């Protein structure tokens, strides 16, 4: 059957709510359409060779971007120093004793710098006592004042703290109203700079006089109305917003500052930092970067999103300080911070990389997901091979012979539903499995378990040698590229399909011949000591030049005993660092002795964090700070218990309104602390419930109040009803009943 492909790439500019993902294309003329393919958007954009702008020292190896040194008390930040670790307190800043105790706990856990929210004069006065007490207790850890809306407060606290963080989105413009403001005349837009300079200059001069540092920290969700009107909530707007303030600093010969470009969406975050670095190269600037994914959430999901954003930038040599923002106690942020920093430093010190090549695949200004071809059904197939891959991103699981000894347990670990003991694919079921060894033909029970998986679309992949030793009907053979080329590019006898195993060290000539191989997918598994990010970029570029559209899954392996956080951090940094560029169609994580269910959920977490495939409710929850108006961890867990079964729905849980409404750009619904003792509920950025006391809640549709006085103890129920009213609710599935398996 002749195969043809409609288009070779799709592009989307990242901005608010950018959820368009382009990937697999249906094959024209295929006898049977690929699953879910009819709904795919056809975007006809020609492939072009890209002149990749310089945003890092090298796209072929990890080399630290050279920066000046910024002094923050006793801590030096910049490329000549190790990556500094940061966190932020969650106590009420006015509670001096509690804040001092938490700062000490964070410093003892490894924090180099600690940020404290300072929202008013009372908090600023408390900061004097906090700094004084910490010095008395022998702690000289630098403190950073987190300032929003209050230039006068920033002037006060600069007397006490070593660094001031200002948000360009609200420092001079005041509190956000999300009103649309149109500047038809560019001169009018430029005239507003004078107001910014008038408000900001006194702080610049004071920091310069006292030797204080500053972070110009743009947040994707809290850009000023003026910037939004001109640039939209785009990475370009984020960078321009920061540069307006940096220009004022430079005008007064003040250079002791760093930049940050935070967003809750890792793709937006990565693009913004790359653009920031690119523009600094163009201007000849060398200011350090503080990295962070804001509102990352908690647990494994929060660590994964942070690793995707922070880790991918560290692999390009970007980043001088980092913070992993988790909805957990701040000292728990230190472990993932250390793991990420160590990963970046190792990549730099060991010179991870590949020989230079001409890169034509990536575009750092837009998100472009590489297009692959889904498997097609063939005449005579006894099994349906279309579900072998998933159009939004594929997850494979590595299964051992020992796993087959308990079939029902295996089915559950693969995420399958059980009906009368029989497996059926669910929304988060592994798409296919990989086995290094196959059961002998005499092992009827194990082979029956595999057959049941095959019959519901969970296909079995195995090395060609293993398949030759123990033939399995319908199995997919795995061969190296060299083996496949030597075999004429066809699947070996006894195999229904062929999968390629790549390791990133293949020659240019071998990769140029990949199109001649009739394979349904390739597994890319780089060996130890080889940079996965850089070698994979080379492979994808070579595959593109060869004219092949073979889907590629990242196969990452870990040694026995690897800590779970290490699995998450490295997977997010190495594989997520490729998926944010659209390079890859899924993942398989293999770790000897590790729980299969953990590896599967981590793989799906990787795809969801990379904005590819949603299999569970997405939570955008802030890490809490002194502004937080309720117990974030407790409330987030309450909401998760009631809404965690809604794949495709994103819910923001924000402690206050500083960034809350804005950072909900990617969320469908929001639960935000509006004032002490009050909660606001949102649909998108539209308030639908506002001013709800802790013992009551108000409801809004658009920006119009429609209900007031809902008791706090029913706040989660009000959120559930809001989801139902907007047609996004589904009932919880019935629990499985244990049933005997038919022989």
Language model features by range: what are they?
Residues 35-87, 204-210, 346-409, 641, ...:
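N-terminal amphipathic alpha-helix/helix-capping segment at the start of soluble metabolic enzymes
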Residues 182-200, 226-389, 473-478, 484-488, ...:
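Catalytic alpha/beta core domains of metabolic enzymes, predominantly
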């Amino acid at each position: 059957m002749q195969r043809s492909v409609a288009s070779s790439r799709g592009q989307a500019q990242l901005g608010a709510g950018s959820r368009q993902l382009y990937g697999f294309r249906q094959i024209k003329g295929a006898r049977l359409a690929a699953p879910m393919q009819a709904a795919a958007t056809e975007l006809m954009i020609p492939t072009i060779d890209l002149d990749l702008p310089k945003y890092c020292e090298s796209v072929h190896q990890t080399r630290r971007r050279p920066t000046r040194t910024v002094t923050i008390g006793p801590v030096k930040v910049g490329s000549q120093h190790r990556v500094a670790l940061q966190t932020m307190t969650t106590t009420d800043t006015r509670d001096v004793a509690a804040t001092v105790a938490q700062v000490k706990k964070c410093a003892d856990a490894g924090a180099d710098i600690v940020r404290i929210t300072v929202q008013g004069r009372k908090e600023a006065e408390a900061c004097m006592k906090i700094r004084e007490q910490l010095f008395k207790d022998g702690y000289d850890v630098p403190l950073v004042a987190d300032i929003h809306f209050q230039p006068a407060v920033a002037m006060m606290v600069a007397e006490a703290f070593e660094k001031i963080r200002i948000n360009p989105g609200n420092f001079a413009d005041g509190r956000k109203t999300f009103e649309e403001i149109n500047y038809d005349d560019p001169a009018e837009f430029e005239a507003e700079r004078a107001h910014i300079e008038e408000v900001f200059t006194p702080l610049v001069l004071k920091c310069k006089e006292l030797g204080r540092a500053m972070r110009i920290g743009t947040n994707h969700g809290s850009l000023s109305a003026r910037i939004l009107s001109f640039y939209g909530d785009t990475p370009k707007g984020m960078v321009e917003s920061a540069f307006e303030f940096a220009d004022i600093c430079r005008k007064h010969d003040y250079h002791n500052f760093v930049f940050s470009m935070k967003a809750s969406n890792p793709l937006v975050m990565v693009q913004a930092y790359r653009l920031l670095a690119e523009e600094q190269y163009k201007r000849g600037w060398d200011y350090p970067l503080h990295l962070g994914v804001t509102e990352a959430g908690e647990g494994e999901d929060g660590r994964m999103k942070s690793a995707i954003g922070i880790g991918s930038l560290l692999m390009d040599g970007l980043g001088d300080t980092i913070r992993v923002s988790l909805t957990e106690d701040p000292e728990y942020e230190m472990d993932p911070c250390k793991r990420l920093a160590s990963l970046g430093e190792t990549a730099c010190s060991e010179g991870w990389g590949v020989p230079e090549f001409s890169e034509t695949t990536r575009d750092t200004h837009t998100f472009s997901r590489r297009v692959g071809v889904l498997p097609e059904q063939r005449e005579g197939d006894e099994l349906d091979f279309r579900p072998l891959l998933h159009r939004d991103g594929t997850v494979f699981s590595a299964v051992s012979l020992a796993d087959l000894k308990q079939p029902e347990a295996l089915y559950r670990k693969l995420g399958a539903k059980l009906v009368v003991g029989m497996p059926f694919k669910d929304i988060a079921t592994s798409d296919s499995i990989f086995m290094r060894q196959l059961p002998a033909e005499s092992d009827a029970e194990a082979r029956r378990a595999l057959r049941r998986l095959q019959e519901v679309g969970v296909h079995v992949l195995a090395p060609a040698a293993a398949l030759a030793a123990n033939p399995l009907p319908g199995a997919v053979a795995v061969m190296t590229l060299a083996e496949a080329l030597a075999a004429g590019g066809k699947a070996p006898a006894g195999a229904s399909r062929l999968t390629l195993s790549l390791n990133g060290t293949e020659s240019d000539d071998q990769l140029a011949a990949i199109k001649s191989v009739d394979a349904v997918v390739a597994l890319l598994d780089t060996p130890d000591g080889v940079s996965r990010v850089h070698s994979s970029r080379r492979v994808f570029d070579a595959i593109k030049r060869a004219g092949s559209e073979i889907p590629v899954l990242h196969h990452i392996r870990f040694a026995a005993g690897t800590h779970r956080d290490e699995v998450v951090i490295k997977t997010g940094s190495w594989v997520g660092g490729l998926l944010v560029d659209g390079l890859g169609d899924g993942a398989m994580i293999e770790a000897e002795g590790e729980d299969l269910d953990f590896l599967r959920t981590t793989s799906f977490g990787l795809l969801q964090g990379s904005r590819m495939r949603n299999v569970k409710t997405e939570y955008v929850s802030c890490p809490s700070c002194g502004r937080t108006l309720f117990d974030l961890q407790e409330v987030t867990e309450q909401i998760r218990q009631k809404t965690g079964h809604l794949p495709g729905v994103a819910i923001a849980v924000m402690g206050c309104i500083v960034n809350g409404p804005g950072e909900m750009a990617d969320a469908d619904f929001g639960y935000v602390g509006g004032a002490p003792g009050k909660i606001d509920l949102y649909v998108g950025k539209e308030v639908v419930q506002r001013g709800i006391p802790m013992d009551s809640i108000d409801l809004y549709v658009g920006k119009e109040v429609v209900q007031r006085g809902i008791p706090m103890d029913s706040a989660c129920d009000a959120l559930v009803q809001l989801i139902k009213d907007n047609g996004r609710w589904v009932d919880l599935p019935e629990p499985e009943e244990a049933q005997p398996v038919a022989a």
